[in-house]
Amino acid sequence: MTSLIPPWERKMERREAEELLRNAVGNATAEFRKDQWEAIDAMVNRRQKLLLVERTGWGKSSVYFISTRILRDRGRGLTLIVSPLLALMRNQIEAAQRLGIRAETINSTNEDDWPVITQQILEDKVDALLISPERLANESFVEEVLLPVADRIGLLVVDEAHCISDWGHDFRPDYQRLINILRLLPENTPLLATTATANDRVIEDVKLQLKDIEVQRGPLVRESLALQILPLPDQASRLAWLAQAIPELPGTGIVYVLTKHDAKQVATWLNKQGIDAHAYYAGVEHADFENSDCYRQHLEELLLSNKIKVLVATNALGMGYDKPDLGFVIHYQAPGSVVSYYQQVGRAGRAIDRAY
């Protein structure tokens, strides 16, 4: 007599998971990149805690969304994704939908939707919930949303995990509240922490805080990127070079600046030269939009759909902005750190053979 294996105990095979990938990307021959399957296997078959350190554009979100799809099909609870930026959440929700995953977010921009989303979470109708680390400091969220479902969370994802460490370049104190959340979860709940920009010191700090976590570390080289340094001694020469070079660069791109003033100044200059450019920074507003978040989302969509040539942005446009065919990233001034530079140039060339 053949014994039936419950769906939550059946081992997922690579070929089955790869079929989910193919459905998501619409490519019948798509295959996992190096080490993607190993990370998925760690989540769904071995139920481990894993810190994934892989280059920008490698496909870290594919790992946790395919894992979510598998775990939900096995009857597990929702995936909780802690993510630092609204732009990142919007991109992730769209990526989840391609896998048939119902993803929702509770954040400062959708307060009117909170009661409906909360009820759907309690009824187990949501596959993935995306929140900011600051949401973990909200007592009503913890008591009304998190505590009632904590014992059945299927997967915890900590995106941009370098933010946990006070040695990290984007340290966010509320990320450390994750330690309290971990205590609420069943012991065998898998955890996936992801980053592209953690040095050895940050990795050791994350391991210390998340405890008993394995590390999977890949090469950080991006072969599709052609990097150049141009010695331009003053502002006038930099502006002149931008006006000459940007029309000749392929596709659309981002010019990174250090300040709000620079963003407005450079965007105005480029527009005067006939280049369709918009300034992007924290708090940027437009009379036609209700608030800054709505206008920033509009600007992101303009670039995503190639309706403008370039965004002139501060680091407000950073982690998580995902435009696979972004053709170029230019730094008008040197960024604050090498890690910030790596994060920002990593916006370009994710799904094209050559970017600048």
Feature-to-residue mapping (PLM):
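Interdomain "pre-motor" coupling segment immediately N-terminal to P-loop NTPase/helicase cores
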Residues: 2-9
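Helicase motor core with emphasis on the C-terminal RecA-like subdomain
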Residues: 9-11, 20-23, 34, 38-61, ...
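Nucleotide 5′-phosphate-binding alpha/beta core
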Residues: 14
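Hydrophobic alpha-helical transmembrane segments of integral membrane proteins
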Residues: 80-81
